């Protein structure tokens, strides 16, 4: 499927990771407005359109939060890029299907039984996106990690989250230990070319009072 998406559609800091298929773990973290979640969706849409097999499981700690966050963001980028004719979005059970047979399913870790019965019309699970990964327990991450298996296609987990405590399992696992299968990218609002000046000024105001939003 040949679709042309201009490089200007992406923030430059993320472009080197658009086609990464060598790492198992892609870690995207940063403060508010950094564009990490938008890039995750842009990247997944690119993979859905260009790879012969790409089936994505999008996960949050609570299933109900997907509708107004991850699922809505997928729909927004599909519309913005003019791809509505190539994707079918099923609001009732939060499923997105690409014209080539690839698809996306949205689930939550608050119902692990439903995670056990996930199937895709075309092939196997190839990608997992864990949004707000700091809200997920390490045990739940491990369960997702071991599910992503199989020969023939590269498997990858993308984790997006804001800066975390020095004691959080994400820091211990991906920052304190150096896993050669993981690539880590920190971004800030300064890397996001699509923010308006008023919002940038708002974030600047948190520099001294709340580094969580600023960093």
Residue ranges of model-derived segments:
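Phosphate/NTP-binding elements of NTP-utilizing enzymes
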Residues: 1-215
């Amino acid at each position: 499927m040949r679709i042309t998406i201009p490089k200007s559609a992406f923030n430059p800091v993320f472009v080197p990771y658009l086609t990464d298929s060598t790492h198992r773990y892609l870690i995207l973290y940063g403060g508010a407005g950094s564009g990490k979640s938008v890039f995750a969706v842009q990247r997944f849409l690119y993979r859905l359109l260009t790879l012969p097999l790409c089936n994505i499981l999008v996960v949050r700690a609570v299933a109900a939060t997907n509708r107004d966050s991850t699922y809505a963001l997928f729909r927004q980028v599909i519309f913005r890029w003019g791809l509505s004719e190539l994707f079918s979005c099923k609001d009732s059970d939060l499923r997105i299907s690409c014209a080539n047979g690839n698809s996306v399913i949205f689930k939550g870790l608050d119902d692990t039984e439903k995670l056990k019965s996930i199937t895709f019309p075309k092939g196997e699970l190839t990608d997992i996106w864990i949004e707000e990964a700091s809200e997920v327990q390490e045990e739940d991450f491990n369960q997702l990690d071991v599910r992503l298996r199989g020969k023939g296609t590269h498997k990858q987990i993308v984790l997006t989250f804001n800066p975390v405590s020095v004691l959080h399992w994400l820091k211990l696992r991906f920052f304190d230990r150096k896993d050669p299968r993981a690539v880590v990218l920190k971004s800030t609002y300064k890397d996001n070319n699509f923010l308006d000046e008023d919002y940038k000024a708002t974030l600047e105001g948190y520099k001294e009072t709340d580094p969580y939003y600023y960093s």
